[in-house]
Amino acid sequence: MLVSDFHFDLPDELIARYPTEERTASRLLHLNGETGHFEDKQFFDLLDQINEGDLLIFNNTRVIPARLYGRKASGGKLEVLVERVLDEHRCLAHVRASKAPKEGAELVLGEDKLGEGNGFKAIMTARHDALFELHFNEEQPVFDLLQQAGHMPLPPYIDRPDEDADQERYQTVYSKVLGAVAAPTAGLHFDNPTLEKLKAKGVNIAFVTLHVGAGTFQPVRVDNILDHKMHAEYAEVSQAVVDQILATKATGKRVIAVGTTSVRSIESAAQAAEKEGKLIAPFFSDTSIFLYPGKTFRVVDALVTNFHLPESTLIMLVSAFAGYRNTMKAYQHAVEAKYRFFSYGDAMFINKNPNALNDLP
């Protein structure tokens, strides 16, 4: 199975660089995975697709202002993108500079926001492949420093500096647990009134946590997808969520994941539980689960997701869920119908294709 099987041509003007004025004002493409039929709708029509007793699972991670601008103490500009906070004073980060800092190098960060001479210092203590371990010398915890001097880490394809409005719009309204460097973007379409309408309809709601890493934007750099090594991200699925999933399945209702990160959290927990002969069990660990055509989904019955990059692991996940041909036809239609793509773009609602295992490239 080749990465090129998941290519499609996307005109640049279809990449959404700003969100819609209202969260729910996006369009929605409804794809029935079983029949392959798709239909153009508006996002607020999603309320008609979700039934009483269904369980809607969201990812409650909160994006940290993870991008810092600065310089080496010896001179030379650099950009830091925090990937993971290790403790109150250490983090792993990507560092972009004309020359990579060496072990022991001192970095001065945040002067663009705090003023010249008011930046804070970090020492590069170790390198772990593409990531640099940074130790912050300040008394304040890393999260506090990022809140003061960090920028929202907008994806590279948005191709503009972050603005004040992004601090709100690049977060879901239910985000709670600090740790992501990218938003779980399917959730950006939900506002509080929509959540209240779902609850009033008798739809159950649960939250998992997966801290989305910068690796989600990395291109697949191999020809055969079986050679791809998936990046790891930390995920949590609590006992309470497991109980809700089991209760939903027992009544014949659907488990609906909001976003691919929710899917990966739930299916990681299910995959780990399979060894114990269970459908799903609590999960608190890193996951590098890679779902592509030929892989099965043990728990998730339907999916809300945005439109993803060509040749990305996320369009591979959607193809595994809805069927390869169904997915590529729906994407072709989305391009022709001028849907808006990627993080600030439009959404899909997909019912699982029970025959997806037979629909391979």
Swiss-Prot record:
InterPro entries per UniProt: QueA, QueA_dom1, QueA_dom2, QueA_sf
Pathways involved: tRNA modification; tRNA-queuosine biosynthesis
Classification via Pfam families: Queuosine_synth
Keywords from the named record: Cytoplasm, Queuosine biosynthesis, S-adenosyl-L-methionine, Transferase
Subcellular location: Cytoplasm
SUPFAM superfamilies assigned to the protein according to its UniProt record, in alphabetical order: QueA-like
Reactions accelerated catalytically: 7-aminomethyl-7-carbaguanosine(34) in tRNA + S-adenosyl-L-methionine = epoxyqueuosine(34) in tRNA + adenine + L-methionine + 2 H(+)
Gene Ontology cellular component list: cytoplasm
Signal sequence bounds: none
GO molecular function, one term: S-adenosylmethionine:tRNA ribosyltransferase-isomerase activity
Gene3D superfamilies (UniProt xref): QueA-like
One biological process term in Gene Ontology: tRNA wobble guanine modification
Top-level enzyme category: transferase
E.C. no: 2.4.99.17
Subunit structure: Monomer.
Family, as annotated: Belongs to the QueA family.
Job description of the protein: Transfers and isomerizes the ribose moiety from AdoMet to the 7-aminomethyl group of 7-deazaguanine (preQ1-tRNA) to give epoxyqueuosine (oQ-tRNA).
HAMAP family in the record: QueA (MF_00113)
Protein name: S-adenosylmethionine:tRNA ribosyltransferase-isomerase
